[in-house]
């Protein structure tokens, strides 16, 4: 589904040639903590695809994260960005550690990576496993990935009137970025309409308070929809204030189909939505840009379990499939999704976060056996 979306977007034309490629160069960026344990899972799955799908992969080990910062002075080395830009069609990014106290010179490498690579959209499917008890959940959260408060323009100063510290942060919403993210969200909704017979786009904002910034986001999303009624007219268009969105998301998640949100709200909503389908350890995402797709599991570096061999690899394996889908290899992606769903639905081989006792590698082996 997602590959056909990407090829229709002018911003993603550079991805179009990858559908014909049988040999792909994939960057592997484990990062910190359990990232070092789950990224090898994605690599093993890709290596397994050659016999059936005729795909071959060249893997390049790359570095980013807090440990890299401690060793080199840079959380995102120039060489990592250079290799991704010049050699890779896709990449897998694990997780990064966030220090509990301020560390001079350190900032999140994934935020910088999204900016450097032009990864304007974070696409996160949130779906319950078929056959589970309860009403099925099946939504896609599309998050603008390059601006909002995450542009990291901040300052701290002393208020002259009180003599106390004040911190300010700039929130940026641009017409260009909003138009781009609204288009990809509507195109995803359009594909779901074609495969399901109905689709709804929900635009999330806080324009009742932030009338200029969120007001612009709301305005441009509506404009993209209204000015392309010949294309999107059968998609139902809704808006939801972000605080009531949180309430409805957890009370009635089945009401949502495709959600589009500015960076901060999308970050919060998509992590929260993972609780609806079991764990952050099972939810994938893809960072999509003009020339490259980077799969990224939704969980963090989990220092409490790092090194124990019990991290859940499912989110990374699904992110690997999502990356392939955007790169035009839908059949291979679907095989991975089916193998993962079979593991979750039928198997007892699950990591502790899902109530099991299996190791990371045991789960990987079970998924591979189902491929």
UniProtKB/Swiss-Prot annotation:
Belongs to the isocitrate and isopropylmalate dehydrogenases family. It is found in: Mitochondrion. The keyword Oxidoreductase applies. (2R,3S)-homoisocitrate binds at residues 98, 114, 124, 143, 150, 206, 208. Pathway: Amino-acid biosynthesis; L-lysine biosynthesis via AAA pathway; L-alpha-aminoadipate from 2-oxoglutarate: step 4/5. It comes from Saccharomyces cerevisiae (strain ATCC 204508 / S288c) (Baker's yeast). Residues 1-22 form a transit peptide. Pfam families: Iso_dh. It comes from the Eukaryota. GO terms for molecular function: homoisocitrate dehydrogenase activity; magnesium ion binding; NAD binding. Optimum pH is 8.3-8.8 for the forward reaction, and 7 for the reverse reaction. The modification Phosphoserine is found at residue 98. Disulfide bonds: none annotated. This is Homoisocitrate dehydrogenase, mitochondrial. It is an enzyme of class 1 (oxidoreductase). One of its GO terms (cellular component) is mitochondrion.
